[in-house]
Amino acid sequence: MTEHDTLRGQLIEAETLITVDELCRHCTVRVEEVIIYVQEGILDPSDDIAVPEKADSWQFHISSVRRVQTAVHLQRDLGVNLAGAALALELMDRIAELERM
């Protein structure tokens, strides 16, 4: 990169919400997988209505994209089962909390 190159990006607030369809598109997963992630406690819809029948209206915080990508990586690339991925994400959350202290 030279001194005249310009970087462009979009600032996304932590409070930004995305639809379940947007989450699926960003993470290349199906809605059925998102439902399973919600049932396993990996994801929480922002409105706390975590019934699968309402999945089409679910919204998630933008940070859920990274969370799903990590879960997918753990499962597909590292062979971790769903319960193991949920546990790993929970431990990663706890570590992040401790680092913020």
PLM segments and residue spans:
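Arg/Lys-rich, alpha-helical DNA-contact motif
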Residues: 2-25, 31-35, 39-101
